[in-house]
Amino acid sequence: MSFPLAHVDATLNQLAKQLIAHFPEQYQDQIFQHIATDKEKPTSNIGQLRYAIAMSDFFAETLQKQPHFLHQCWQQCPRLQDCEQYAERLTPLLAQVENEEQLYKVLRQFRHREMAKLSFCQSLNLGSVEDIFIRLSQLAESVIIGARDWLYQRACAEMGTPVDEQGTPLQLYILGMGKLGGFELNFSSDIDLIFTYASNGETVGARRSIDNAKFFTRLGQRLINALDQYTCDGFVYRTDMRLRPFGENGALALSFAAMELYYQEQGRDWERYAMIKGRILGANAQDPHVNTLQQLLRPFVYRRYIDFSVLQALRDMKHKIEREVRRRGLVDNIKLGAGGIREIEFIVQVFQLIRGGRESALQQPALLKVLPEISALELISAQQQEDLRQAYLFLRRTENILQAIHDQQTQQLPENTLDQQRLVLATQRFTQWDTQNKLETVTYPIHDWASFCEVLQQHQQNVRTVFDHLIGEEKEELSETETLWHDFLENEIEESEIEQMLIEHHIEERDFHEIIEKLMQFRNEVTRRPIGTRGRIALTQVMPTLLPQIFAHTAYLHLLPRMLNIVDKILTRTTYLELLVENPQALTQLIELCAQSRMIAEQVARHPILLDELLDRNALLNPPPYDHYASELRQYLLRLTPDDEEQMIDGLRQFKQATLLRIAAADILGALPVMKVSDHLTFLAEAIIHVVVELAWQQVTTRFGTPAHLAEGEKGFLVIGYGKLGGIELGYKSDLDLVFLYQSDEQSQTCGGKRSIESNQFYLRLAQKIISIFSINTFAGVLYEVDMRLRPSGESGLLCSSISAFKAYQLHDAWTWEKQALVRSRAIYGEARLQTEFNAIRAEVLSAPRDLATLQQDVVAMRQKMYAHLAHPDSDTFNIKTDRGGITDIEFIAQYLVLAHAPQNPALTRWSDNVRIFEIMAESAVISQEICDQLKQCYVDLRNRIHHLNLLGELSIVPQTEFQTERQFIQTIWHRLFEHNDKYEE
């Protein structure tokens, strides 16, 4: 319907005449005369009154019911500055109140009078859209707190004053929820409140004490009546208490402790959304209980971790609202309809709930204050922010004009011509704040109802575009197969139907029994576990996606129990189920990794926090550069309390597990060759060793101080890595072969601690502490198994030796096998000068003259001893590590070459890893380049196979038919070295 603006003015003039006819006669004549003469937009006092009367029946009725207010307006029309300092103006009125009947009257008349002023300012565009809803909120807060304080004094006189254990008087705290909490109250809105008090106890000062709970419940009931009860003067605010814990079935007022327990254990999604805007009304910053209550509620709303339930819960709420809109026929509802106010609120709440725990700028209730913060974080574009802001203000302007007409809570567009005309006039031109909080006038091409609808629909379309992009459309209908799996979880299909599904997935019939048994066990487990509604919804969403992917995989018999075990472990940790629902690529990634690695499946099941690592495929396939492990680890530990040893120890384990997953994923998916895998695993271990030593040093020095002979900043301590750590060849399950050395000073004592001990005892305590940190079995598992048997004198030797004692032992007492071990050693931790000293000792020992025949005899004897001890009896299989032609033979060959040729060429002692040992041997013409290349290739191939067997959780054993060529070549080289002593040239 269209109508010209001249017709609108005529209609409103006629309406004004009808409404003014009820005014006292002395006002009627002057207004009628003004209507007859003033044809332009009203500018005079009477003209403004006439216009405001025409725009709002409520304004006219308030003038009629309160003649003294009409007289005030006649003398001077309301201004925006008259709509302030509500508490200061209400307090003297309440001071004169003697009973509850008078209280009801004063509150209602004050509320209507002040609302009428705001209606006037809104109609005449004397304040911005924000000015109006902020003042509406301030008015409500002042009235609520004024009523509470008056009733509190009466209640204390009657029932005594509630106090805590220290005898301090307690007050009733009121949480304003929804738009009241966000200073965004509608013109005619319900107010959502929650009542709480600091602690239990009893009242004092009355003839008969009652407990605090009863006192505050009665006070709350009286306050609700004072606000909500309808009298001849109307009501103050429709009061809704259903947002309190347990809703209508819960206590009207709860203590802080009871409220905290509820939100920790039973708080639901919609309560988190509601609590975003929760604000303590009348809060006094000097009141310690105010801060306590705020701190109590914040963790419930703003989680420290990213909560992926938010998106799905918002979708569910959206669909629920859409069903309500359809059911109630609310097609033209500017709040609940598509692109309406609620969708803008949802958009902002999504980011508050997902990011608010980490971004404090998002932890505020006012939507228009949060919106630019979201844009500043680049979560939405500047254009999207502006679209949402403009739409919100237009919709809120429309909503408040609608509600001010009859003081009715409505968001439904009017069907009658009169109210449509009012909206047209009110939305053509109005003021609002810009992004710099400065007043701006906005003008829309609105001249009739049709053009109003066009503008409205454009705003709604802008909102819906952002909303759909963020929240996402409703998921597509499940396929028939997915529906069947969904029904299986709900116990709605029989075993025969499961068999039919397996046939459709091309599963071998011989596997049916095993698969169905595992599925039934899983379903029975789900049935008896208390996973809650949210968890059950997430499970029914993830399983129909998970199971078809498992059965599409060739390794489904191995994969099914691994994946079911992971799901079983996260059944009661709904956030992780929802992570897999919201991130299908993460689920697919997990399936692929678990298919190829039992180790990963077990780790993820034991530590579900690792699922977070699957979210970023890019990061997953790109482990940090070698030199970044140390900085990444330190950055990771910064979020922990440095003095909390237990927390730091767990943090080290969690970092290792997460990083190990990234390395394994890159390995499985082909992003890392075997040599790089070992490099990454080794540098990861080194970074952890550095932090462990620092942590142990901190603990030991706190108690004993530091050795007096050390210069400032020195530790005088070396960690030597042997074996695979020393050779930069760590595998996924490798332990750490370590030797600890220290800078000696026989007479030195520690100083600066609680107790002084000898320096050698200090380093022994340090070594023990390091081993303890590595080996202690926490919930997060063991950090690394540590093997100290390669220290001087082995298990009978000191746990930590001085550098000088180590040198003497290696030069004069070490066995040949210990010198072999020294080949694969290198300094991992310690001051540069000490590492240089160790390198010199190592080079001196390895290049010392030795009898070649004795060396050959010792090496062969040690290898024979290992064969006998680690013999693999199964002739049908090959142990890659210990059998002839395997890894151990290659390692012995490398060690022998160094010990045999370093006396003539000390440069051959430079490297500790087998690959570079072979390379330097070829460069020095000890072996040919061809043999070097073949040895390296054999070694890499064998290690690669071991890596992948480790990932599968299997032993390093393969069928006898594998690696026959490699084994034959290695045995040939062994034979030439130790039985013919040739020049090893081809």
Curated annotation (Swiss-Prot):
One of its GO terms (biological process) is regulation of glutamine family amino acid metabolic process. It holds the Pfam family GlnD_UR_UTase. InterPro entries: GlnE (IPR023057), GlnE_rpt_dom (IPR005190), NT_sf (IPR043519), PII_UdlTrfase/GS_AdlTrfase (IPR013546). Its cofactor is Mg(2+). Involved in the regulation of glutamine synthetase GlnA, a key enzyme in the process to assimilate ammonia. When cellular nitrogen levels are high, the C-terminal adenylyl transferase (AT) inactivates GlnA by covalent transfer of an adenylyl group from ATP to specific tyrosine residue of GlnA, thus reducing its activity. Conversely, when nitrogen levels are low, the N-terminal adenylyl removase (AR) activates GlnA by removing the adenylyl group by phosphorolysis, increasing its activity. The keyword Magnesium applies. Keywords: ATP-binding, Magnesium, Multifunctional enzyme, Nucleotide-binding, Nucleotidyltransferase, Transferase. Its EC number is 2.7.7.89, 2.7.7.42. CDD domains: NT_GlnE_GlnD_like (cd05401). This is Bifunctional glutamine synthetase adenylyltransferase/adenylyl-removing enzyme. Belongs to the GlnE family. GO terms for cellular component: cytosol. HAMAP family: GlnE. SUPFAM superfamilies: Nucleotidyltransferase, Nucleotidyltransferase substrate binding subunit/domain. Residues 1-475 are annotated as: Adenylyl removase. It catalyses: [glutamine synthetase]-O(4)-(5'-adenylyl)-L-tyrosine + phosphate = [glutamine synthetase]-L-tyrosine + ADP; [glutamine synthetase]-L-tyrosine + ATP = [glutamine synthetase]-O(4)-(5'-adenylyl)-L-tyrosine + diphosphate.
